[in-house]
Amino acid sequence: MKRFAHHTAQSIREAVRLLKAYEGKARVNAGGTDLLGAMRDKSLPSYPEAVIDIKTIEGLDYVRKDSKGLRIGALARLADVAASEEVKAEYGLLAEAIRTVASPTIRNMATLGGNLAQDVRCWYYRYPRQIGGPIVCLRKGGKICSALAGDNRYHSLFGAVPLAEYPCSSHCPAETDIPGYMDRIKKGDLAGAARILMEYNPIPAVTGRVCPVFCEPECNRSEFDDAVAIQCVERGVGEYVLENAAVYYAPPGNETGKQVAIVGSGPAGLAAAFYLRKAGHRVTVYERLPEPGGMLFHSIPPFRLPKDVVRRQIEALAGMGIAFEAGVDVGKSVTMADLAGAFDAIVAACGTWRSLRLGVPGEEAEGLHYALEYLKRINSGERPPLGRRVVVVGGGSVAIDAARCARRMGSEDVHVVCLECRDPASKDRMLALDSEIRQAEEEGIQIHPSLGVQKILVKDGHVSGIDAVTCLSVREPNGSFNPQYELTCTAATLEADSVIIAIGQAADPADTEAVKRAVGTVLFAGDMVSGPSTVIQAVASALQAVRAVESALNPGRPEARVVKPGPLFVEAYLDDSPRAPAAELPVFQRMRGIDAEDSPGASLAVVEGEARRCFNCGCLAVEPSDVGVALVALDARIVTTKRTVGAAAFFNARATCSTILDADELIREIRIPKPPEGARQKYAKFTLRKPIDFAIVSVASMVVVKDGVCKDARIVLGAVAPEPLRAKGAEGAMRGQPIDERVATEAAEAAVQGSLPLAMNDYKRSITKALVKRSVMGE
């Protein structure tokens, strides 16, 4: 056993002081029957620096009856509580539960407070380090509950404790509740899934096509087979949203009378417009180009994002009452001062439309194009001639888009030259998505990684090719851009009829200057805040701008978007099905032009099937306390050093703990009200061997019977969920009914309604029903 500091506290105050001093790195020893063994086995998530012994604190081992009921000190030994005449006389349920705990020796040592605060008994969590190293389950900082795909015969029958932060959601810039909307789809509630998704992202039909899916690499499903195809599901929900635009883009119920101008109609501008209009403001969106949509319409090729989708998205937003003013160049045809005088707030979401120059000799020659301008021209219907041989300089998505457009429009020999390497694990990897690079190579485009353009070759005033040198590294260890080259020789020479530069972009200086001169409430969103970013990053930025606008226009008013608390338990899935393959046109069809969408999308059946693959990540360990189940049935209250809560609220399990106790919080007392007159109390427990083993299933019941009819009931299930679970369905089936075989059977069936058996624990349903039936009948 490792060394640790040991402190013997003489008072509750001293114990709390010590716990605070160790800042969560100390553990409390309240009985000594579990903690030291766990430390010896090194099974805890982290080894404590100190153990605070509170067994010697005087005055907390009482069992007292008063006019309100029973009061038990937190350090009362279990054996003493069970032997108490007051407990045996009126609280037989508690006495029965205690008698099933462990052995007489342990009951003579263990305390009531210690039993309530004990750690879970999941064997993955408790696996001794000495046997073969720790099992890094969810409670120990792992990504997934080991029981989900492993042996789960003793685990939860009613779902998992949801994570406070899901890996997929936390890596989404908009923090989208991905498990939330997946769960709705599993239950056949596509409308509910759409409502959840729209809280975070109002353009899912767009992001479902062009999002770089920061979420999918973090999906825990990849530990089992393949990550959930989140983008496929999002696109399916997005299509449903656009098909039902009148529902999801409805005008607000109340108007605030405030007016907001949005400069720019790209993803940030559209998202900001949606949320501000939803809040009740009048919104006008200004777009410099002839048609709204910003980068979505004028930069992304139609084979990735069809123009019809963008137009339908704009029409849906216009249906909310959002006004779009296209062909208006803010700063020229209308000034920021004009907008400031007419609107209560302005959101500047102008984007980054100025292409960065390469800064090498030959950049002024004819036949040299900048990617954004080139893409804007082809998206407007032009087909600029490039010649047979094209070199695209850059390693991001824009470069790949430009290269694929050139190849599809007739250029036979297309090359992409970039500083970045192809190693996906390197800090210097290409910024384009792997899928984009794969598709480009399928279409005959050659990628030349780790090369930097030294000069552009010129013949008769027209580009004729490039000379390139080896790029040794692109970024410093801290991530800053600082390419290093091997300049002693030319690494490659490529001939070209056209060269397209796609090395990045920045905000137009005119836009920046116009915004700087603006007065009033002006907020920034999208690329003007972060520089070039993805569509979902622009949406996330818009949400921040909207909150700032709301704060400025309505000081003191709560945020318009309130994320509702998640469910108590979530359904843990292990649907043994492979990831749906992405639907994609064959290469020969893709090469016919740029107008047909590469990915036709998935059917609703495929979307639903993919959603069912979501693990709904959570912890499946069950609450181990026999006494806790009894106290919930008795409607007890737990008094701590910080608060007084009902027993049901005390066992508020989370993925990394089982109770509400803070690191510096201790139980002082347990208060149990007088049982109702005529209450029949029962504790039933099923174990594999001796009654003192940990429960496979337990049932604590308190049934109030008068003249053979149930007047009230509290039935609590133990060892079937991450915390003691009220069987409210069973209680409802009993109230007002005669206590007989029929009612007991109905109550037993109701008790397991909503259960979510895992691969190996369906047997718990039968045991639960049998114990509930016996408890109702008083057997």
Language model features: what each stretch is:
Residues 1-173, 624-779:
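C-terminal structural segment of proteins
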Residues 133, 141, 153-156, 160-166, ...:
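Ferredoxin-type iron-sulfur electron-transfer modules in oxidoreductases and energy-metabolism complexes
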Residues 138-162, 246, 372-393, 471, ...:
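Surface-exposed acidic, glycine/proline-enriched linker/cap segments
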Residues 181, 213-263, 279, 307-314, ...:
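FAD-binding core/adjacent interface of flavoenzyme oxidoreductases
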Residues 244-260, 471, 565-578:
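Long, charged amphipathic helices and adjacent flexible linkers at domain junctions
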Residues 263-286, 325-340, 354-356, 373-434, ...:
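Rossmann-like dinucleotide/flavin-binding elements
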Residues 282-285, 289-319, 324, 378, ...:
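Rossmann-like dinucleotide-binding cores of NAD(P)H-dependent redox enzymes
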Residues 438-446, 452-462, 544, 551-616:
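Mid-to-C-terminal Rossmann-like scaffold of FAD/NAD(P)H-dependent oxidoreductases
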